[in-house]
Amino acid sequence: MESFKDEACAACEDVRWVPAWGKDRMRSMILERTDWCISRQRRWGLPIPVFYCKDCGKPICTPETIDAVSRLFEEKGSNAWFEMTAEEILPEGFTCPHCGKSAGFEQESDTLDGWFDSGSTHFASMERTQGFWPATMYLEGLDQYRGWFQSSLLTAVGALGRGAPFKECVTHGWTVDGQGRAMHKSLGNGVDPAEVFNKYGADLLRLWAGSSDYHVDVRCSDEIFKQLSQNYLKFRNTAKFCLDNLTDFDPNTLVAPADMLALDKWALTCLNALIVKVFTAYDNYEFHVVSHAVNDFCVVELSSFYFDIIKDRLYCDGAESLSRRSAQTALYLILDAMTRMFAPILAFTCDEIWLAMPHRTGDDERNVLLNEMVQPYTQYALSPEEMARWDRIAAVRTAVNGALEQARADKTIGKSLEAEVDLTVPAEDAFLSQMEEGALADLLIVSQVRVETGDSLSVTVRPAAGTKCQRCWKMLTSVGTVAGHEDLCPRCAAVVKSLPVVE
């Protein structure tokens, strides 16, 4: 080992270790190692191809003997070493290179260490195939720093005079039960994957693997699967909402960036950030970051904010109106991106979504994984200054939601659309008063809003004036002003008038 320790340690520098502390762990093991015992005393395994001269007692391992053993193994397999005599294996007329004797040889009875076998696979599987050496990545458990990882590195450096046979080395912990105990038959705490498939579906097991930080020991139990099933349903319901609202949408006619509404651009800017985060995580083999980021996006940005706000546009605006098609464009791009991004983890669910959703010309509709990965939609992105304003809108909305909850508890209102809100905002939020009439009310999901500037944010909730529109449920003083549609607001009356008459 002393003859190539420095080279082996230097080879560690050219490898990307995941986690990063793997490099120091490997280097320290190599530096502490003085010898490498590659022989084992057993009657099975790969023989050590060395002969001994009975006369002089010296070992014999020459190109000639190696060729003879190689031909033998190719013809009869390695067991022939134990079934034949040395004279039967060696070439006819062979003589000892040390003493010149032509008879009296015996073969080594020890076998090679199994780690030497596995550590040589890079030569057998990659060296002989053009362009495949070194491997992109080696993946194994934490114990393999002393096993396969190290033996592969040492054989490559010591025998071939090269660097490590892998560009990246990724390690994982062990699967343990919900209490952190090792799984044993005696404890009865093992988890059968087939039972998980039957109870929850294969994708939930994939989601468990993709949600776990595998660099440490990973817990596995039915309770964990139950909790994860909620995350799975959230993703599935998010996709269902998008699909339900895209049945009449042609993705080949996306709304142009210049025409898209600001809220929809906000959603796509959030999506862009998700795309960057997801692919950075994939590049770093941090699959749990992918799963948690997608779940947070579905819960925080979409379900709790964006989806609630756009429902009125999707359900009540004209089918071909810019406002509705703008929302549909954003929904389509969100669904398309999430399906492509999450397919490596939720392979079956994403394929199911892919088969159900509309597609642009050029997409391979057979399977999502046959398509290119998504890139950020920079053409729809808002500027950092614009996103900062949306952060303020979200903060105001949180305050308004709190006031609405209190008003509901006080029986002042029932649904939020029964409310009129008076907002006092600080100077930094004065832009809210400049928003298009009705736009802020839509963002807050109330019927009417009044805004004035003051020293700090305050919210007052009262019952909205006017009559309830029977189509959009908003309380407006304009309801009934359109002849023939006395129970509708002007917006809804115009949409209803435009609908085809069914005879």
Please give the residue ranges for each predicted region:
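Residue-level signal for inorganic ion chemistry
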Residues: H172-G173, F235, L302, A347, ...
